[in-house]
Amino acid sequence: MGEKTIRFSVSLPEDLLKELDSRVIKKGYSSRSELIRDLIRELIIEEKWDSETEEVFGVLTIIYDHHQRDLTRKMIDIQHSKYVNILCSTHVHLDHNNCLETIIIKGKPSEIEKLSIEIGGLKGVKFSKLTKSSKVEL
């Protein structure tokens, strides 16, 4: 971030400022400015996800029972059918029965959401969560 930083002021009601300061401490930020910068970036990412013209990224985290009949094959088939969107995946053995997989996906928001629902809805998937992101050049 080699851009010039510009200082400006913000007026807030006292209760809202207390909430802000509480979050700065809770999340370990070094200053209010750091928290506000992250909140603005989050807003930009949300807006990109609301647009169908932007390429965005997502990380799908799933936990599943690898003993579930045909589940692994179905997940691999889905990923291979969408190889243009799937950047990579990481597989971790949690215990004898359960695996955790993260799948990094790129594409239009609707493509990523559809793919996440398709994988997350398979029988044997115990947990599925899509974390939304995008390139933020700020």
UniProtKB/Swiss-Prot annotation:
This is Putative nickel-responsive regulator. Disulfide bonds: none annotated. Transcriptional regulator. It comes from the Bacteria. Binds 1 nickel ion per subunit. PANTHER family: NICKEL-RESPONSIVE REGULATOR (PTHR34719:SF2). Pfam families: NikR_C, RHH_1. GO terms for molecular function: DNA binding; DNA-binding transcription factor activity; nickel cation binding. It comes from Persephonella marina (strain DSM 14350 / EX-H1). The keyword Transcription applies. Belongs to the transcriptional regulatory CopG/NikR family. Gene3D superfamilies: ACT-like. Chain A, domain 2, Met repressor-like. Keywords: DNA-binding, Metal-binding, Nickel, Transcription, Transcription regulation. Ni(2+) binds at residues 80, 91, 93, 99. Its cofactor is Ni(2+). One of its GO terms (biological process) is response to nickel cation. Coiled coil: none annotated. InterPro entries: Acetolactate_synth/TF_NikR_C, ACT-like_dom_sf, Arc_rbn_hlx_hlx, CopG, CopG/NikR_regulator, Ni_resp_reg_NikR, Ribbon_hlx_hlx, TF_NikR_Ni-bd_C.
